[in-house]
Amino acid sequence: MAPTGAKKGLLERLDAGEVVIGDGGFVFALEKRGYVKAGPWTPEAAVEHPEAVRQLHREFLRAGANVMQTFTFYASDDKLENRGNYVAKKISGQKVNEAACDIAREVANEGDALVAGGVSQTPSYLSCKSEVEVKGIFRKQLDVFIKKNVDFLIAEYFEHVEEAVWAVEVLKESGKPVAATLCIGPQGDLNGVTPGECAVRLAKAGASVVGVNCHFDPMTCIATVKLMKEGLVAAKVKAHLMTQPLAYHTPDCGKQGFIDLPEFPFALEPRIVTRWDIHKYAREAYNLGVRYIGGCCGFEPYHTRAIAEELAPERGFLPPGSEKHGSWGSGLEMHTKPWVRARARRDYWEKLPPASGRPCCPSMSKPDAWGVTKGDADLMQQKEATTEQQLIDLFAKQCIKSN
């Protein structure tokens, strides 16, 4: 059982060397359940289907998560009206952000969890809007987070450290702790800034916790955080480390991560990591000195539970979800079939290389790698829906780049 009593804050926990377990992926999980639209990936489900969002929060809490991130990924006003999205006009960004905060707080109060208000990269930045304009967008979300009194703030899912720094500077105005994660790999951000330099810039901007999230698999994210740590040490700048990777294997992706893979987003299932992969990830992250350990897209509650179970010796307790889960498959000793009972042991699962079950499935893919980033014509955003001619042009370009 988790400790009882008054909740300690994020920095109080991290400064004491405690492990803070983040939650998992919401947009992918809720898209598969029928509550989020793939493409815009916006979080209007917080208003339209609050029971679905609430239930997913509860499952992550039961699995051992110490943090309930508000379901505010891509909840900036410009994203909610981008390319024909109806949310900004019919619901409003303020209502989405407020509802997400209320749901996260309700569930966090059911356990030893903190509420984190989150912002992410914006269409405005990709369209080369000014620093003042982009910061104004973040500030609208921050106003809601302050009103709802979240426990700390996260700037997550940024491909460019420049925009992430702008977000951190705005979030620091609240006086609350700020964490910041980039969706980058070992090659650095899309402007070529190294992971080490990215970490230093984020920390100097005011982030108390820095790291990575999304776009890459667990072990790639650990490699990136290692470079961040080295950069911080070299610059003599202090910050806690965090990592919230994908739950997909991505050894073949390029600099932009899994969104470059041909399977994104509807055919990623063969790449899903096992719970045993997550045991290894949690241990590697802990040994590196990372103390905020969670997940992003593809991370389901059973992945979060694997983190909590792997680090139970350090934390001193198991999550409630472990009541129905035997350690390293030990519950299989109750199975009716003897060959399945024989799998009730750690070394079996650690040594197993899972098969895909697809005879003609390649082990690797060729990333699309269009190489576009901020300022490119194809990334300039618009309020109007994508036109048929724009799609025809993109289809033609895809054919050329695939040959």
Swiss-Prot record:
It comes from Xenopus tropicalis (Western clawed frog). Homotetramer. Its EC number is 2.1.1.5. Involved in the regulation of homocysteine metabolism. Converts betaine and homocysteine to dimethylglycine and methionine, respectively. This reaction is also required for the irreversible oxidation of choline. Its cofactor is Zn(2+). Pathway: Amine and polyamine degradation; betaine degradation; sarcosine from betaine: step 1/2; Amino-acid biosynthesis; L-methionine biosynthesis via de novo pathway; L-methionine from L-homocysteine (BhmT route): step 1/1. Its main location: cytoplasm. One of its GO terms (cellular component) is cytoplasm. The keyword Zinc applies. This is Betaine--homocysteine S-methyltransferase 1. The gene is bhmt.
